[in-house]
Amino acid sequence: MINRSAGKDRDRSRSGDKELRINHKIKAREVRVIFDDGTQSVLPIEDAMRCARDAELDLVEVSPNVLPPVCKIIDYGKYKFHQGKRQKEQRKNQKIIKLKEVRMQPKIDTHDLDFKYRNILGFLKEGNKVKVTIRFRGRELAHTHLGYGILEGILERIGDANYILESPAKMEGKTMFLVIAPKSKK
């Protein structure tokens, strides 16, 4: 027989969704209890459980790594709901910046270069970083100045204050690249 539950527990711990200990699952003998009105006191676990039971709420261990562990007397279902709502709001407000790559060769035609330039501008307007890469093959490596010229031309055409050069043009093996990023709106 295969034990399938071990994998599920491992996946849950990896996702960062740690379960808080509540009521009888709290293992400490003594806890610091924060009441609804904000007052604190250090109580034996039995007294803290009794206070929670009298208020018809749950005793939730919110900070287990301190001595004594910090517990709150709250409605656990309501607490989980608000935690989920807060995390959803944080994910919604988070902006993911992607790195887009535009590749070309040193012997690129002007029309093709114009097309690549429009792609670069489009990526920057979307808020993404752009890595402009020029690949050299064979004897083209003897003419790296052509690559620098192309990259300089792109930077001159962009020349807008809304974009910054994050990484200047440099050679790495047979490729030359630079990274352009949009300025952050603060």
From Swiss-Prot:
Gene Ontology terms, MF aspect = ribosome binding; translation initiation factor activity
Entry superkingdom: Bacteria
According to the record, the residues making up region (Disordered) are 1-20
A GO BP entry is: ribosome disassembly
Name the cystine pairs: none
What Gene3D superfamilies does its record include?
Answer: Translation initiation factor 3 (IF-3), C-terminal domain, Translation initiation factor 3 (IF-3), N-terminal domain
Identify the GO cellular component terms for this protein.
cytosol; membrane
Just give the chief location class.
cytoplasm
Assembly mode: Monomer.
Instruction: Output this protein's name.
Output: Translation initiation factor IF-3
Q: Which organism is it from?
A: Borrelia hermsii (strain HS1 / DAH)
